[in-house]
Amino acid sequence: MAKQVAFNEEARRALKRGVDVVADAVKTTLGPRGRNVAIDKKFGSPTVTHDGVTVAKEIELKDPFENMGARLLVEAATKTNDVAGDGTTTATVLAQAIVHEGLRQVAAGANSMMIKRGLDKGTAVLLQAIRDLAKPVNDRTDISSVATISAADSSIGDLIAEVMDKVGKDGVITVEEGKGLGYETEYTEGMQFDRGYISAYFVTNSDRMESDLEDPYILITDKKISSIQEILPVLEKVLQFTKNFVIIAEDIDGEALPTLVLNKLRGTINVLAIKAPGFGDRRKAMLQDIAILTGGTVISEEIGRKLDSATVEDLGRARRVIANKDETTVIEGRGDEDAIKARIEQIRAQIETTTSDFDREKLQERLAKLAGGVAVLKVGAATEPELKERKHRVEDALSTARAAVEEGIVPGGGIALLSVLPALDSVVPANQDEKAAVLILRRALEEPIRQLARNAGEDGAVIIDTVRRLQKEKGDSTLGYNVITGEYGSMVEMGIIDPAKVTRSALQNAVSIASMILTTDALVADIPEKEAAPAPGGMGGMGGMDF
């Protein structure tokens, strides 16, 4: 297919037009006074959203060169969303401002590579200043404030703070569509996995169709048990202490299963047999998690152990094990605290190094089951568009709250970026172009607060001047403007705070994408094919004639 090519100024101007289309649509959603954007869907009702990244992802432009600029900006928003869960609109606003100022300098004769080098120097200093500005999240109020700002709804903020308080910072919180009109929460205590009892004959509560064992001994193995003789030695030893016995194995079949069922029905032993969760390497890891949580040992031939060698010391313990046909919950495992902490740190390290989103999600689930708990947040609404929009806001608020716990909080409302501007004084530019890059950053970092003011119908320049004057007079870098009340004051005291991770990621990704655009000198794209004109219709047949 033939290609079209654009060079230098023409190429950069095309990218800028694409950037502007996306940024102008997205930045209207910034802040509590931000507007909604309606997105047409081929099927069903339109989506009405206040979420920047959702708007950005939907934009596709006809001109291939302009579309490249649009896609690059979407990349900045998406990357920020992936890393921090929020801050997509801020990243978009910053990137647009850097592109505008940068292109002006390049058009005036500046070297784009020197501009990029200056941007990199300035950004490194600013990122460190944001980290230094951050304060750790100490209480539930901070989490509530962060989530409230993200969702623009205090009820969502309070709900997320309550849920995070219950399941802990490492707990798994999932968001689902509910059946009602409001919000519902479900909690799971202990470790839960998606495998239930092997046979309904193990049920102890026929009303709830559950097997509920108090203070059982737990045999954990990755083997299939086919003969009762394999586990008879350990069974006889357990019966000296208790009748409550749980077996977690790859499978139980052959004569082993009917023998266990028969002894359960006779009352000889109160046994519960469960299939091991997961598959392959993940199964081995999950069995090891269960063993560490309960203080047991996984009986596996990989470590040279056979089932008939199992002793009471190899068995895990828990206050309670509950199983139905679909899932099992182990409550208050009696494992060693230090061993559990070491396992948690090991999983955390794996989360940091993995490149697969799927693996990361599964590792986070395992971490939550060991360290915290599991909560399900069910979101309801009167109509489907409202439900989707509300669910988006809850997911964003949850991600923002997690980011705040991770790296701390900074003043919100664009004030954090304004507060770190003096850090640029320490940058030593090697030439005039690098000096121009520092000036580009100074101008760009004011843009989020200008846009917040614009969305609230205020004059951004006046607000920035007033904020700077008040900060200088009172010596307080947290002073800012509340666009909801129209008052100046400490952003932290007013509960207007952002996660440092969100602010940092937004700046980092905005500079990265803007630098890429500024240093682009050629664009190559397919020449769009003209659609062929429809063929003329055939002649109508003549009625009454058979051939």
UniProtKB/Swiss-Prot annotation:
This protein's record includes keyword Acetylation: no
InterPro entries linked: Chaperonin_Cpn60_CS, Cpn60/GroEL, Cpn60/GroEL/TCP-1, GroEL-like_apical_dom_sf, GROEL-like_equatorial_sf, TCP-1-like_intermed_sf
Primary subcellular site in the record, as a coarse category: cytoplasm
Places the protein is found: Cytoplasm
Residues bound to ATP: T29, L30, G31, P32, D86, G87, T88, T89, T90, G413, D498
GO cellular component, one term: cytoplasm
One GO-annotated biological process of the protein: protein refolding
Classification via SUPFAM superfamilies: GroEL apical domain-like, GroEL equatorial domain-like, GroEL-intermediate domain like
The protein's name in its UniProt record: Chaperonin GroEL
